Amino acid sequence: MPKETGRKSIAQNKRARHDYDILDTYEAGLVLRGTEVKALRAGRASLVDGFAQVSDGEIWLHNVHIPEYTEGTWTNHAPRRKRKMLLHRAEIEKLIGQTQEGGLTLVPLALYWKDGRAKIEIALARGRKSYDKRHALAERDAAREISREMGRRVKGRYR
């Protein structure tokens, strides 16, 4: 079987970019069981309620839903079990310091295959208040309208 190359997306957490201000992103490996790998190969996972937490100098991923493998038997995994994330020691130390600072959390943004290995993109993030969410939405709409108008002007279609 030829070795896989490139990046193939499994799941995205679009809600995280709306609910949080993303300060920094990291790529981490995951410690998975056999049936979890097979379920991910089938493209089934949900990052919606997921978060990462530091415990005993390690970073653990909580509440990420990888459903049971349909062809699995008694060896199937628990869908929402906590999973260990694999990062370099320096990255872990940096994240420990920043999350203990207060107001910052680790949220998963994307789950994907990279060269045949399951990877997760996590973000160091600060939660947004509801008025911040509305403000960010208004800014995005204004930028979209400006670019749309600039496109019209370039094409010579004035309103």
Curated annotation (Swiss-Prot):
<dbReference type="GO" id="GO:0070929">
    <property type="term" value="P:trans-translation"/>
</dbReference>
<dbReference type="InterPro" id="IPR020081">
    <property type="entry name" value="SsrA-bd_prot_CS"/>
</dbReference>
<comment type="function">
    <text>Required for rescue of stalled ribosomes mediated by trans-translation. Binds to transfer-messenger RNA (tmRNA), required for stable association of tmRNA with ribosomes. tmRNA and SmpB together mimic tRNA shape, replacing the anticodon stem-loop with SmpB. tmRNA is encoded by the ssrA gene; the 2 termini fold to resemble tRNA(Ala) and it encodes a 'tag peptide', a short internal open reading frame. During trans-translation Ala-aminoacylated tmRNA acts like a tRNA, entering the A-site of stalled ribosomes, displacing the stalled mRNA.</text>
</comment>
<protein>
    <recommendedName>
        <fullName>SsrA-binding protein</fullName>
    </recommendedName>
</protein>
<dbReference type="InterPro" id="IPR000037">
    <property type="entry name" value="SsrA-bd_prot"/>
</dbReference>
<dbReference type="GO" id="GO:0005829">
    <property type="term" value="C:cytosol"/>
</dbReference>
<dbReference type="Pfam" id="PF01668">
    <property type="entry name" value="SmpB"/>
</dbReference>
<dbReference type="InterPro" id="IPR023620">
    <property type="entry name" value="SmpB"/>
</dbReference>
<keyword id="KW-0694">RNA-binding</keyword>
<keyword id="KW-0963">Cytoplasm</keyword>
<dbReference type="GO" id="GO:0003723">
    <property type="term" value="F:RNA binding"/>
</dbReference>
<comment type="similarity">
    <text>Belongs to the SmpB family.</text>
</comment>
